[in-house]
């Protein structure tokens, strides 16, 4: 009636909660460990209900841990980069033990465009992830290595999630995205992650970009 060709609904890897098995496939149990993930699970259900009830051409995309230029200052990668860029030797972060599946923003954007264009993905839930797992601690160390500095890492209790809401492990199975969307990573694996971090660091090296971030303040 409205001429809608496709609806691509943005979900999140957070709907899976702490991984019960890895890599995480799209049929992994959903676990609302936080109000945020609970609302996303609800939104996913509403989106899929329109597909079932009205044949609306819906695809649900679940991106894992996207990073890159212009990311929110609350995320770990810009938090670490901006602190180091402002010549702080002691870098303050949250929990260091959880693992994540980080994805450079251009890979994720290409995945969304592919989902928009794909007929085969209608009525499907699709993970967009790198299939590469790394801990927060190793991520911080990698950033410091790329920026050529030695740092002390300090955990700030203010930056810790409530214990039961912390997602301890995320690691995506991206085989469905490859199969249905023809999606391939340009920034995959450790080397790809390092290249994405390097490009992100270069963006923050511009003084006009860096000044938009308050490295000493953690905004809730």
Task: Give, region by region, the residue ranges found by the protein language model.
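C-terminal substrate-binding subdomain of Rossmann-fold SDR/epimerase-dehydratase oxidoreductases
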Residues: 85-220
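Short coil/turn segments at alpha/beta junctions that flank glycine-rich nucleotide-binding fingerprints
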Residues: 2-3, 53-57, 73-74, 87, ...
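Short clusters of hydrophobic/aromatic residues that line enzyme substrate/ligand-binding pockets
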Residues: 16, 23-24, 67, 91, ...
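Short beta-loop-alpha junction of Rossmann-like oxidoreductase domains
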Residues: 19-20, 69-75
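N-terminal Rossmann-like NAD(P)+-binding domain of SDR-like oxidoreductases, especially those catalyzing
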Residues: 1-66, 146, 195, 199-207, ...
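Active-site proximal helix/loop that lines the substrate pocket
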Residues: 12-15, 65, 71, 117, ...
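Conserved active-site helix of classical SDR/Rossmann-fold NAD(P)-dependent CH-OH oxidoreductases
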Residues: 41-48, 52, 78-81, 110, ...
């Amino acid at each position: 009636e409205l001429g809608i060709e496709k609806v691509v609904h943005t979900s999140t890897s957070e709907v899976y909660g702490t991984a019960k098995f890895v890599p995480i496939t799209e049929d992994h149990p959903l676990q609302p460990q936080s109000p945020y993930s609970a609302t996303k699970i609800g939104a996913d259900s509403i989106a899929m209900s329109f597909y079932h009830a009205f044949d609306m051409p819906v695809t649900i995309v679940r991106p894992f841990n996207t990073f890159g230029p212009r990311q929110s200052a609350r995320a770990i990668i810009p938090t670490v980069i901006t602190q180091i860029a402002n010549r702080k030797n002691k870098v303050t972060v949250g929990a260091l033990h959880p693992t994540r599946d980080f994805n450079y923003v251009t890979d994720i954007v290409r995945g969304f465009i592919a989902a928009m264009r794909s007929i085969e993905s209608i009525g499907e839930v699709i993970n967009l992830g790198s299939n590469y797992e790394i801990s927060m601690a190793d991520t911080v160390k990698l950033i410091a290595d790329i920026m050529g500095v030695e740092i002390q890492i300090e955990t700030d209790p203010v930056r810790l999630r409530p214990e039961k809401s912390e997602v301890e492990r995320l690691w995506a199975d991206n085989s469905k995205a490859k199969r249905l969307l023809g999606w391939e990573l340009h920034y995959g694996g450790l080397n790809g992650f390092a290249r994405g971090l390097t490009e992100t660091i270069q963006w923050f090296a511009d003084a006009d970009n860096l000044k938009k971030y308050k490295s000493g303040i953690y905004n809730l």
